[in-house]
Amino acid sequence: MVNMKASMFLTSAGLVLLFVVCYASESEEKEFPKEMLSSIFAVDNDFKQEERDCAGHMRECKEKLCCSGYVCSSRWKWCVLPAPWRR
């Protein structure tokens, strides 16, 4: 009975150790692609999205007009999709 408990404990400890080692090596491997992708897709100031003259979906429409395909909700003052019940 004692040998079975000891073997179960050693098996559990071995699995935990294996998990920790695999996790550590995997986290090191994950850092490299992240760094590479961030350097490839670095965003310049020239490529940043310019602010629109219209408000998109679920944006406030108090000062800006809604973009085409959206209407300003009279209740919440958000740009929403037009629907038959919103007339």
From Swiss-Prot:
What UniProt keywords are attached to this protein's entry?
Disulfide bond, Ion channel impairing toxin, Knottin, Secreted, Signal, Toxin
Which GO terms label this protein's molecular function in UniProt? Answer: ion channel inhibitor activity; toxin activity
Q: In which tissues is it expressed?
A: Expressed by the venom gland.
Q: Which residues form a coiled coil?
A: none
**Which superkingdom is the protein from?**
Eukaryota
Task: Report the GO terms under cellular component.
Answer: extracellular region
Record propeptide residues: 25-52
Disulfide bridges in this chain: 54-67, 61-72, 66-79
Give its localization: Secreted
Which InterPro entries does UniProt cross-reference here?
A: Huwentoxin-1, Huwentoxin_CS1
In the record, which residues are listed under signal peptide? 1-24
Q: Please explain the role this protein plays, according to its UniProt record.
A: Ion channel inhibitor.
This protein's domain notes: The presence of a 'disulfide through disulfide knot' structurally defines this protein as a knottin.
Homology family: Belongs to the neurotoxin 10 (Hwtx-1) family. 51 (Hntx-8) subfamily. Hntx-8 sub-subfamily.
- This chain belongs to the protein called U3-theraphotoxin-Hhn1f
Q: What's the source species for this entry?
A: Cyriopagopus hainanus (Chinese bird spider)
